[in-house]
Amino acid sequence: IPYESSGFPYLPNGIYKWINVRQNIIDAQGKNKTILDIGCGIGFSTAASHGSVGIDTDEDLLTKAKNLFPEKRFEYGNPLFWKSKRKFDIVTSMFYLHENPRYIRKKIVKMALETAKERVVFVDLAPDYFGSDELLKRKPFLKDYMLHCREDLIDFEEHVIVKGRLHMWVYEISGS
């Protein structure tokens, strides 16, 4: 049975405890890291540390993000064309890859690897996630993502966050 939660952006941790997986991922990167968040949505996955920025292509989501998190920095940015004048310590993307067709996912991965100094972290649905028919209708690229995400992220180390639901892929940049 797929997990449906009204506790967004939290995941259950035991019966009465909830964890904010996005914030835990950000915190795990270390203090004072500059983090680029690709596909930031309404900003929960964007770090507040100085020099960090969240990018997204949806102006409405960016407006909501700026209102929710005035202490964070957000920019309009299409990962196919967005170019940074500098590199970031860490590049993250959370719950975004499955929203895109494969050719765009590959470009997102390439851009992330070119922009990160230390590591790239992708957090998304598990490849064996069982999505409802309704979810599959709303997420047209989900099936393709589940079929190809491991192949597309073959150079990344895969970690299970919630079995059958949520995985993380990490690529450590050599020499960092």
Summary of predicted features, one role per range:
Residues 92:
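A conserved beta-strand element that flanks and buttresses the S-adenosyl-L-methionine
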Residues 96:
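Hydrophobic adenine-recognition pocket in adenosine-nucleotide-binding enzymes
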Residues 116-120:
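Short glycine-dipeptide loop
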